[in-house]
Amino acid sequence: MFMGEYRHNVDEKGRMIIPAKFREELGETFVVTRGLDRCLFVYPQVEWKKLEESLKNLPFTKKDARAFTRFFFSGATECELDKQGRVNIASPLREFAQLKKECVVIGVSNRVEIWSKELWEEYFAESEESFSEIAENIVDFDL
């Protein structure tokens, strides 16, 4: 399981360090794709396969299903870490997530998310205020 928040930098070649605590669970190869809220989603292969199976079952006759799967899969790229524990993030993905220099890497259960520092701080500030309300609306168990 992925959890925690880490701050890292993207270098001029588009490489960034993946936190050591995430490396083993990500495995030798993993998938990076466009996520929701202008961040990147990073999945270990086993989780990616589960997600792929679920998304294949969406009705392709529905316009929204086609749009979502196109968006999600067209941005996906298989990646691996170099010897220094860095991943090279493709330019279109960096542009999508507005990754320039500083970024935030967070663990979210079965995936990792990569955010620009600015977008993460903005998202967190907005979400922090409504966290209790969000939890009340979606969570059906005691925290």
Curated annotation (Swiss-Prot):
It comes from the Bacteria. Keywords: Cytoplasm, DNA-binding, Repeat, Transcription, Transcription regulation. Signal peptide: none annotated. Residues 5-47, 76-119 form the SpoVT-AbrB domain. Its main location: cytoplasm. Pfam families: MraZ (PF02381). It is found in: Cytoplasm, Nucleoid. GO terms for molecular function: DNA-binding transcription factor activity; transcription cis-regulatory region binding. InterPro entries: MraZ, MraZ_C, MraZ_dom, MraZ_N, MraZ_sf, SpoVT-AbrB_dom, SpoVT-AbrB_sf. One of its GO terms (biological process) is negative regulation of DNA-templated transcription initiation. One of its GO terms (cellular component) is nucleoid. Belongs to the MraZ family. PANTHER family: TRANSCRIPTIONAL REGULATOR MRAZ. Forms oligomers. This is Transcriptional regulator MraZ. It comes from Halalkalibacterium halodurans (strain ATCC BAA-125 / DSM 18197 / FERM 7344 / JCM 9153 / C-125) (Bacillus halodurans). The lineage of its organism: Bacteria, Bacillati, Bacillota, Bacilli, Bacillales.
